[in-house]
Amino acid sequence: MNDFPWLTIIVVFPISAGSLMLFLPHRGNKVNKWYTICICILELLLTTYAFCYNFKMDDPLIQLSEDYKWINFFDFYWRMGIDGLSIGTILLTGFITTLATLAAFPVTRDSRLFHFLMLAMYSGQIGSFSSRDLLLFFIMWELELIPVYLLLAMWGGKKRLYSATKFILYTAGSSIFLLIGVLGISLYGSNEPTLNLELLANQSYPVTLEILFYIGFLIAFAVKSPIIPLHTWLPDTHGEAHYSTCMLLAGILLKMGAYGLVRINMELLPHAHSMFSPWLMVVGTIQIIYAASTSPGQRNLKKRIAYSSVSHMGFIIIGISSITDPGLNGAILQIISHGFIGAALFFLAGTSYDRIRLVYLDEMGGMAISIPKIFTMFTILSMASLALPGMSGFIAELIVFFGIITSQKYFLIFKILIIFVMAIGMILTPIYLLSMSRQMFYGYKLINVKNFSFFDSGPRELFLSISILIPIIGIGIYPDFVLSLASDKVESILSNYFYG
């Protein structure tokens, strides 16, 4: 059963099925939409089935592994495999992409191309999470950028070309560092290139060289995460992109950067990570405060939510930097948690825009009476974003706190200072999120406008909102469901460190 190429099928299926849509006769936008949704649902069911029957949670080693010779000339292999670190992100990718496709129903212009790009992005993201070969990881990383650029450049606001150009300059520029790191690591210390991640995990390097590799990978993943000061592409991109694209960006794309930090920087380069972790922790703490302070000054609704994403990614960076079992588990839980919360907030921001055609918060107000369902869902998900107890964000941030407290690597005074600054950031978070809700839904601005009337959530939008809310509450009540997937892998990664 395990010899069956599950992962190859899971990676190749979305882009292959999407390609058929481009060559088949155009049957109307509705056919394209339902075809894409059926592909996404089938892919998600296939992934879930493959993992349920073949993945063993108590095994930290690579499972469902596939190893095929691909290009003889380069001695290049198609290596796939999953472990506790990648299974959660792959399932998150399937879930969010399916809902984003359903959210994209209002898109009518170039519908075939739009849905093909979403499916191509789907393949690239799953390929990145399941690659066990460093060069294959890089190829999948780059494959995923092209659909994102086109989705940004062709569908969105008035400044979409500017934001798409900024996105590609940042990400393509950072990919140069990723490629240099991949080639450097693969060519070091052997006559033949070594690209197998399992072999590279046992490789040791001179200190200076390991630091150089670490910095190269860190720059690449810092842009994607994003880590300040390499975050400035994110608010512009979210501000202009169609909200279904924003769901994919916030829900999955940002998580690829955090995944790369754990998979490559932390697992392959433990000595350099141990040296850089105090600085990363300081940067993560500053990021929480900076984003929480900058967000209230944003007039654009989606830009304000984008800065909340930057703030939440700070907790992931701190968890990764703590080099402890609770810290890293908390970071992985926050990756999954914010994937749901970020996607949900952008979806609700987009549905609000579909009704009032306004993007600036100071022009909104008084919508709560007319659209009570959207108001209720937005309020609940804002509470999830500010880490209300019972929601997934609360337990993730709490575990990260425990990770800092239990870390033996840092002095007590340093830990107290970090926790104090993080606490200030957590106080600022409700201020900008509740202020955002107040500006949107309370007051009388739109009610006093002549001919003011718009409809509340329909069945599709309500289904989408509830579908994302269920896992947020589910993880908040029973986080062990997610934590149990990665716990053995986390212990395996931390066994390379002297602190734990």
From Swiss-Prot:
Q: Where are the transmembrane segments?
A: 4-24, 35-55, 87-107, 113-130, 134-154, 167-187, 211-231, 242-262, 272-292, 305-325, 330-350, 364-384, 386-406, 411-431, 462-482
| InterPro entries with a match to the protein in the record | NADH_Q_OxRdtase_chain4 (IPR022997), NADH_Q_OxRdtase_chainM/4 (IPR010227), NADH_UbQ_OxRdtase (IPR003918), ND/Mrp_TM (IPR001750)
One term of GO molecular function = NADH dehydrogenase (ubiquinone) activity
- Known EC number(s)? 7.1.1.-
Please name one Pfam family that this protein belongs to. Answer: Proton_antipo_M
Question: Top-level EC class, please?
Answer: translocase
Which GO BP terms apply? ATP synthesis coupled electron transport; electron transport coupled proton transport
Q: What's in the keyword line of the UniProt record?
A: Chloroplast, Membrane, NAD, NADP, Plastid, Plastoquinone, Quinone, Thylakoid, Translocase, Transmembrane, Transmembrane helix
Does Plastid show up as a keyword for this record?
yes
> In terms of one coarse class, where is the protein primarily found?
plastid
Give the source's domain of life in one word. Answer: Eukaryota
The answer to keyword Transmembrane helix applying to this record is yes
Query: Which family does the record assign?
Result: Belongs to the complex I subunit 4 family.
Know the name of this protein?
NAD(P)H-quinone oxidoreductase chain 4, chloroplastic
